[in-house]
Amino acid sequence: MYQKRQAPTLSSKEAAIQLLSRRDHGLYELHQKLAMKGYEEADIEAAINFCLEHNYLDDLRYAKSQVRQHVYKGHGERRIRQELNQKRVAESVIEQAMAEEPQDWFELAKLAAEKKFKGIKAKDQKEYAKQVRFLQYRGYSFDQISYALSFEDED
C-alpha cells in the first residue's frame, strides 16, 4: 500500500535553491519541505546554512512579504501574526517586519468592512454581530472593528 521513498535525485542544496527560486520560504518551512523530500537531517542543515550564507534564505524578507500579502488580502494584524507564528517565524522577526511595513489598521478594517458589506449599516443586533465576527476572523481588534463599523453611518 505504501511505497518506500526513493532517494532524492537532486542534492539538498539544489533542492533548496529550486524551492527558493519559486518564492521566499521561512527557515522552518524550507526545513520541512526538504525533510518531506527525504533528505537526511545533516544534508538539510548544510543546505539551510548554505542558503543563509548566500542570502537566499532570509526570515525577515519572508515575513515582510507575508505581511504585504496578507494586507493585500484584507487581513488584520492579529491574523498576520498568527499565520507567521504558525510558520514558526521568530517573534522578534515578526515585530521587525511589522515595524518595517507600517499599516493603518483602522483604515484597513474600514476598507474590509466596506468591501464585504458594501457600506450597508447593520439593521439589527444579529447583523451587527455577523459583521463583527467577519472582521474578528480577519484579525482586527475590537477597537478597529468599532471604528470600521461606526464609520459607515457617518457617510
Curated annotation (Swiss-Prot):
InterPro entries: RecX_HTH_1st, RecX_HTH_2nd, RecX_HTH_3rd, Regulatory_RecX, WH-like_DNA-bd_sf. It comes from the Bacteria. Pfam families: RecX_HTH1, RecX_HTH2, RecX_HTH3. The keyword Cytoplasm applies. Its main location: cytoplasm. It is found in: Cytoplasm. GO terms for biological process: regulation of DNA repair. Coiled coil: none annotated. Keywords: Cytoplasm. GO terms for cellular component: cytoplasm. Modulates RecA activity. Belongs to the RecX family. PANTHER family: REGULATORY PROTEIN RECX FAMILY PROTEIN. This is Regulatory protein RecX. It comes from Vibrio parahaemolyticus serotype O3:K6 (strain RIMD 2210633).
